């Protein structure tokens, strides 16, 4: 055999079988950086149609987690696939840099501002801390193979961005959307600040649930309403609440106008009294209150009780009955304790009735000094004391511990309160912001489509947006208000532009350093500077304006796509929609795509306490970024995304199949020069032309899947193509021709030309997902080419040509089915020790007339398709009993061991081995391939 080895075309490549990604990828990243790859991509797309994916900024605090990785990889896949589609698709990553979490970290290091350190120094420390966090996260994102403008990202703390945030607020003001008011807002007593909707998490909490009686002031008038002539016992309207601490702020009792209310007399332990509650709940109520007997004395509509007055249970005033749409009969009594300073619904209904917005609670959650009974007590600790006082006053009808979902601070994980404070709001309804936003939601494509109804519900029900915070590290609300009437300076918009110019030069500290007289002159004495800062959701929500509209690479195009986790419907998607609608009366995006959260293999949330956290840094260090990228792409992101070591190892197995396919392609293109050796698709062997045609079809399906953001479909199509059509059919069949045909022969060059086209196409298919591997393959492909696959477009060399003489695609698919059935019998013969390998076999196909004609058309080349040394086709009627019926209708198969001699060069067993005296160990075909013109192939 050694004499003939040099006559074979053995595969050879520098592309290693093992990826060794964890070690090889960092060196590739260094080359990408040194070659300024991102800039090369930008230069290659000058003048092309833009596609703008705007990066939602992660918070500049802590290491990136697996959810961050999913998000950035999905964005990178889209950017790279859009670039391949010919778009100019810049990617500018960003970071959210202001806000409380950074303040808390800096406080741990240097103390609170105004104590050991000045506010100005504190802000500078916050800036340094955020910058260091950005640096750490940036390195981790780059390690994932994400290409972008990493050297010039956007930061919400960039001076220019801070200035643009101020300018954007000026637009909101000039369009009439800003208002000041005392309203109840989510308030964290640990933060000492208002919270945005998106900063509130709901957790279970046990609270005291109490039923409290408010005694009627004018008993005869109430009895008359119910048509009762006389009643000699106390009468109370009863509320049910889980926040006893809010009772000092009670200013009304709310009921539903259309509900029936009853006057019920009941006796408990020889004490008789009457209560007013909703009719549908009265039996539950008297049972809950331990009644031994009860009687309904009268029944009227809620609307008839409006403005009836009842005495506060422990404060020296009485409160009215008011009508509210928010009153339900899901639980309680059908009467709602109303404290306008401690609840959104209470506030809204209170405004209609001109109720006082009482707020007896300070920033720290402690009752103010002038609060009767509870001054100096923290509200949550005061709950028990409120209950005790109610009991003492005879107003407590029931008291139980109640487990329920309650809002908590996202940062401190502690319960929060609703608290009325003077704040700045973007009004949802004053200038029609809500209706415009709802209309714009309809003009946006939501992926998955359930995102639309989700955000519609949120917008329809959301309160005014409280955009002010009482913090140190944030973009200031750069307003001057009149000291006497709290009205904005009439020139606020132009003054804000002057302040923005200063911030652009010196950062937000310029506002705190500013003496009002520098801008207001003699008017300075009449105005005070606002010291509040903006909600950080305003910072990130305005980036369509402060970043996209401001940076030249976006060409003023506007944003095509926002892509974030499903929690951002109430976060970034919402704040961006509100601000874009407030500024421009249109949505900031054309498409919004959401992905699910990452969970472990059992569907559980990632948790350090459970020990199921998968850190992306560990994955890249162990398996490589391409494995992580393949897992992301192969997972349906529309739901929860399961990840575990086992799942990642499965992704690594899939990766090996793709890598092995790439290696086969490269190894068999050894010595192929496209310019000199290419066979036109029309001139190829039929099987090769069919394979190019199949690749063209797969490419169109893969491109369509990329366009629809169906990346799991991309990986499925890719794996199917590599494993089935290439791996177990085409590549198996062509090995013989590739290795044994004459090196320069048409038969071999045809096959190599097909492999070249497939490799050129496939390297592009995988580039958005397996970026490192695609680059590795690209560097080793033959022919002249640009430095990187990432500057290319989808391959156009896959000509879908069908000649008259060609077998139809369905014909090849039938042959593939026949081969699968033959393989089953060959495998059985191997298990039965009849054969060693398939080339020891001779196969007879007993087929019905139609099938026989389709199989026999290949003639002697049928054996190459079946990977046997001989293959015959006979009528099915001639099949002996030993022939095996297959799952393919009209086909029986008989496998036997050939008695022909084995050719030492091609390993086929042929009758003509030794027929040429000079080559006694070779078959006639191999002699032709060594000394003659080389064999000709028509089909395979």
Swiss-Prot record:
Localization: Cytoplasm
Domain of life where this protein originates: Bacteria
One of the record's GO cellular component terms: cytosol
Positions annotated to bind L-isoleucyl-5'-AMP: 564
Residues annotated as binding Zn(2+): 903, 906, 923, 926
Reaction catalyzed: tRNA(Ile) + L-isoleucine + ATP = L-isoleucyl-tRNA(Ile) + AMP + diphosphate
InterPro entries: aa-tRNA-synth_I_CS, aa-tRNA-synth_Ia, Anticodon_Ile_BEm, Ile-tRNA-ligase, Ile-tRNA-ligase_type1, Ile-tRNA_ligase, M/V/L/I-tRNA-synth_anticd-bd, Rossmann-like_a/b/a_fold
Domain note: IleRS has two distinct active sites: one for aminoacylation and one for editing. The misactivated valine is translocated from the active site to the editing site, which sterically excludes the correctly activated isoleucine. The single editing site contains two valyl binding pockets, one specific for each substrate (Val-AMP or Val-tRNA(Ile)).
Name of the molecule in the record: Isoleucine--tRNA ligase
Organism in which the protein naturally occurs: Shewanella amazonensis (strain ATCC BAA-1098 / SB2B)
């Amino acid at each position: 055999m050694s004499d003939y080895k040099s006559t074979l075309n053995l595969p050879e490549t520098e592309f290693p079988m093992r990826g060794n990604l964890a070690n090889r990828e960092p060196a590739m990243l260094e080359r990408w950086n040194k070659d300024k790859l991102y800039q090369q991509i930008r230069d290659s797309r000058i003048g092309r149609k833009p596609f703008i994916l705007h990066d939602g900024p992660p918070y500049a605090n802590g290491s990136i987690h697996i959810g961050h990785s999913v998000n950035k990889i999905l964005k990178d896949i889209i950017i790279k696939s859009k670039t391949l589609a010919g778009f100019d698709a810049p990617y500018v990553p960003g970071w959210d840099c202001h806000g409380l979490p950074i303040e808390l970290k800096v406080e741990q290091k240097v103390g609170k501002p105004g104590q050991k350190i000045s506010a100005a120094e504190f802000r500078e420390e916050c800036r340094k801390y955020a910058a260091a966090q950005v640096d750490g996260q940036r390195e981790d994102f780059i390690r994932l193979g994400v290409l972008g403008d990493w050297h010039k990202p956007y930061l919400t703390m960039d001076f220019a961005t801070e200035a643009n945030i101020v300018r954007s607020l000026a637009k909101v003001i000039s369009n009439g959307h800003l208002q000041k008011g005392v309203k109840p807002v989510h308030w964290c007593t640990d933060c000492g600040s208002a919270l945005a909707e998106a900063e509130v998490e709901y957790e279970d909490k046990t609270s005291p649930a109490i039923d409290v009686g408010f005694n009627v002031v004018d008993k005869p008038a109430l009895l008359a309403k119910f048509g009762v002539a006389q009643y000699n016992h106390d009468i109370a309207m009863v509320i049910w609440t889980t926040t006893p601490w809010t009772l000092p702020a009670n200013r009304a009792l709310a009921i539903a106008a259309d509900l029936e209310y009853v006057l019920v007399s009941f006796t408990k332990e020889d004490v008789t009294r009457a209560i007013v509650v909703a009719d549908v709940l009265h039996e539950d109520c008297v049972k809950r209150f331990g009644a031994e007997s009860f009687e309904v004395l009268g029944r009227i509509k809620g609307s008839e009780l409006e403005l009836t007055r009842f005495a506060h249970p422990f404060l020296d005033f009485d409160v009215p009955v008011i009508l509210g749409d928010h009153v339900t009969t899901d639980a309680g009594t059908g009467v709602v304790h109303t404290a306008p300073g401690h609840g959104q619904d209470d506030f809204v209904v209170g405004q209609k009735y001109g109720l006082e917005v009482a707020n007896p609670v300070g920033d720290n959650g402690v009752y103010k000094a002038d609060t009767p009974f509870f001054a100096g007590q923290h509200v949550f600790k005061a709950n028990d004391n409120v209950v005790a006082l109610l009991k003492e006053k005879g107003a407590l009808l029931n008291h139980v511990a109640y487990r329920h979902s309650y809002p908590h601070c996202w940062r401190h994980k502690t319960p929060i309160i609703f608290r009325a404070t003077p704040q700045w709001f973007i009004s949802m309804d004053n200038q029609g912001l809500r209706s415009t936003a709802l209309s714009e939601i309809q003009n946006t494509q939501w992926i998955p489509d359930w995102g639309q109804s989700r955000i519609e519900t949120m917008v329809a029900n959301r309160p005014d947006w409280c955009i002010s915070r009482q913090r140190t590290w944030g973009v200031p609300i750069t307003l001057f208000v009149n000291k006497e009437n709290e009205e904005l300076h009439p020139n606020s918009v132009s003054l804000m532009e002057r302040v923005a110019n200063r911030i652009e030069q010196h950062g937000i500290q310029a506002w705190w350093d500013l003496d009002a007289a520098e801008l207001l002159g003699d008017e300075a004495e009449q105005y005070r500077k606002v010291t509040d800062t903006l909600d950080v959701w305003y910072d990130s929500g305005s980036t369509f304006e402060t970043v996209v509209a401001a940076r030249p690479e976006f060409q003023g195009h506007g944003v095509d796509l926002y892509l974030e986790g499903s929690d951002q419907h109430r976060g970034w998607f919402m704040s961006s929609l509100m601000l874009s609608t407030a500024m421009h009366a249109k949505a900031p995006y054309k498409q919004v795509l959401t992905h699910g959260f990452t969970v472990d293999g059992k569907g559980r949330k990632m948790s350090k306490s459970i020990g199921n956290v998968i850190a992306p840094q560990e994955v890249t260090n162990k398996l490589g970024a391409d494995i992580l990228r393949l897992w992301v792409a192969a997972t349906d992101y529309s739901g929860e995304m399961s990840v575990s070591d086992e799942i990642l190892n499965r992704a690594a197995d899939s990766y090996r199949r793709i890598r092995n396919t790439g290696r086969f392609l490269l190894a068999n293109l050894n010595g192929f020069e496209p310019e000199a050796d290419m066979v036109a698709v029309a001139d190829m062997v039929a099987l090769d032309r069919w394979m190019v045609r199949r690749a063209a079809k797969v490419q169109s399906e893969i491109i369509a899947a990329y366009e629809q953001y169906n990346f799991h479909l991309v990986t499925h199509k890719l794996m199917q193509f590599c494993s089935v059509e290439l791996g177990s059919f085409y590549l198996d069949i062509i090995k013989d021709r590739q290795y044994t045909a004459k090196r320069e022969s048409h038969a071999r060059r045809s096959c190599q030309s097909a492999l070249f086209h497939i490799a050129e196409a496939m390297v592009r298919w995988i580039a958005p997902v397996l970026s490192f591997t695609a680059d590795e393959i690209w560097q080793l492909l033959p022919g002249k080419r640009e430095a990187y696959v990432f500057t290319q477009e989808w391959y156009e060399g896959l000509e879908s040509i069908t000649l008259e003489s060609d077998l139809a695609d369905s014909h090849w698919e039938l042959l593939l089915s026949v081969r699968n059935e033959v393989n089953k019998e060959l495998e059985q013969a191997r298990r039965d020790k009849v054969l060693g390998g398939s080339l020891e076999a001779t196969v007879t196909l007993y087929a019905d007339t139609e099938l026989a004609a389709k199989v026999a058309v290949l003639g002697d080349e049928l054996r190459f398709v079946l990977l046997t040394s001989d293959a015959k086709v006979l009528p099915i009627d001639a099949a002996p009993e030993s022939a095996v019926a297959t799952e393919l209708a009209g086909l029986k198969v008989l496998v036997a061991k050939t008695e022909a001699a084995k050719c030492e060069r091609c390993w086929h067993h042929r009758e003509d081995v030794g027929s040429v005296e000079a080559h006694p160990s070779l078959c006639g075909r191999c002699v032709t391939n060594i000394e003659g013109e080389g064999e000709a192939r028509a089909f395979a």
